[in-house]
Regions:
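Sec-dependent signal peptide recognition
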Residues: 1-7
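Intrinsically disordered, low-complexity peptide-like regions
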Residues: 2, 16-17
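Intrinsically disordered, low-complexity segments enriched in polar/charged small residues
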Residues: 7-8, 126
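C-terminal motif of bacterial Sec signal peptides marking the signal peptidase cleavage site
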Residues: 11-13
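C-terminal "post-core" interaction segments
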Residues: 23-34, 179, 190-191, 218-404
Length: 404
């Protein structure tokens, strides 16, 4: 759940006569942002020292009048991401609603096991399938490390989930000095280049999609079917495998849990596959009936859970609970959401900076008491390659079905 706060500046006060240069409205807004983050977040300094955060906040506010729009965006993103790991809800998201919308180069990227590839584009469809090797004069590895301090995350999986949005945001690339001017040159492993102009982020979000959206594909793998259904229950292998695609942790789950249990009890069922790879959260009070059913011996002994980088927020809580309550085997990538994490963010609207900053307001502890693990580990790590994706293969599900 997110709430909205608008930072209202009290501009009626006058600076003292000994202060010839009072703070500008933008400087006051940024100072108030840092103060509001301290007051709102239950443990802002879990990974970053208080002195470091305050120094960075003051540095940004002091420099603000001299910053370009791009540098300001980068500075606010950096400040928001300072809290560190297990804090992926505290952030400036490029595809969010901002008072002054951001701009992106019209590509959708994905970080496969064999590198960052184009999985979709607007106006340059021939780029799909190409591996990115550089942006401007920087190698992609250099660009990733320059962008890293801006990307909110619970863990490395979550970082890789959101990273592509920042790698295509024009204000980010210009503000970091990776590109100059409006256009950006993306270089690819086949020796080709593409010079791209930015478009409104909303245009890309509504077509290619941002990180939470399923990857665009012409194929029909099981895990990308029935995407409009948040709780999709079906069978595979002629009824021998029960497959449940849990896409959002929202809505009642009692009826679905009972149906899953009934299918698992049928003679000849050898496996229950519970797929949360596309589940980026919702409400962690809704999945109790599912958890109860997964702990039933008739389900538990057949249970395999598929997780991925976009398994986030309440879905990360769910995975941690399944891990504690059952002997399920976990396959895929570690969930992008930590077992215990800061969440329930509010949205702070910066009117003068033209940005929306999200700040966590609660700590959700679903791991053991005091658990600071960044991820729920997988028993078998399986990460698709670009070749797998573009051929329509799902090596994660294939491995789950092949387990003894």
């Amino acid at each position: 759940m997110r709430r909205i706060v608008v930072l209202a500046l009290l501009l009626a006060g006058c600076a003292g006569s000994d202060d010839p240069q009072p703070p500008t409205p933008l400087q006051r807004e940024l100072s108030e942002l840092a103060e509001t983050m301290e007051l709102t977040h239950p443990e802002l300094f879990h990974d970053v020292p208080r002195a470091t955060f305050r120094a960075e906040g003051a540095k940004l506010a002091n420099a603000a009048p001299e910053l370009t729009r791009d540098e300001l965006v980068v500075g606010v993103m950096r400040l928001a991401a300072l809290p560190g790991a297990r804090d992926g809800h505290t952030a400036v998201y490029p595809f969010d609603q901002h008072a002054r919308g951001l701009h992106v180069y019209p590509l959708r990227l994905y970080d496969f096991a064999d590198g960052l590839h184009v999985v979709g584009s607007l106006g340059a469809e021939g780029l799909t399938g190409r591996r990115v090797t550089a942006i401007g004069d920087r190698t992609i590895a250099e660009v990733v490390e320059l962008v890293r301090p801006l990307v909110p995350h619970d863990n490395e999986s979550g970082f890789r989930w959101l990273l592509p949005e920042y790698l295509t945001t024009a204000e980010v690339l210009r503000g970091l000095g990776i590109v100059a001017g409006d256009t950006a040159t993306y270089s690819f492993a086949d020796g080709t280049d593409a010079v791209l102009e930015p478009v409104d982020a909303g245009e890309v979000a509504s077509t290619l999609g941002g990180a939470p959206a399923p990857l665009p594909t012409e194929h029909d793998p099981v895990w990308l079917r029935e995407l409009a259904t948040d709780q999709w229950l079906t069978t595979l292998e002629g009824g021998k495998v029960v497959y449940f695609g849990y896409r959002l942790t929202t809505g009642p789950t009692h009826d679905t849990a009972e149906r899953l249990l009934a299918l698992a009890r049928k003679p000849g069922v050898r496996r229950v596959v519970f797929d949360v790879r596309l589940n980026h959260g919702g409400d962690n009070t809704t999945y109790g009936p599912l958890l109860d059913v997964l702990a039933r011996p008739v389900v538990e002994r057949k249970l395999v859970v598929l997780t991925g980088r976009s398994t986030f927020s309440a879905a990360g809580n769910f995975v941690a609970e399944v891990d504690r309550a059952t002997s399920a085997r976990f396959l895929g990538e570690p969930a992008g959401g930590a077992p215990s994490q800061w969440g329930d963010s509010i949205a702070i609207m910066l009117e003068r900076a033209g940005l929306t900053v999200h700040v966590a307001t609660a700590y959700w502890e679903f791991g053991p008491p005091g658990d600071k693990r960044q991820e729920t580990p997988v028993d078998v790590r399986v990460e698709p390659t670009a070749a797998d994706f573009f051929a329509g293969r799902d090596p994660v599900l294939a491995r789950a079905l092949a387990l003894p």
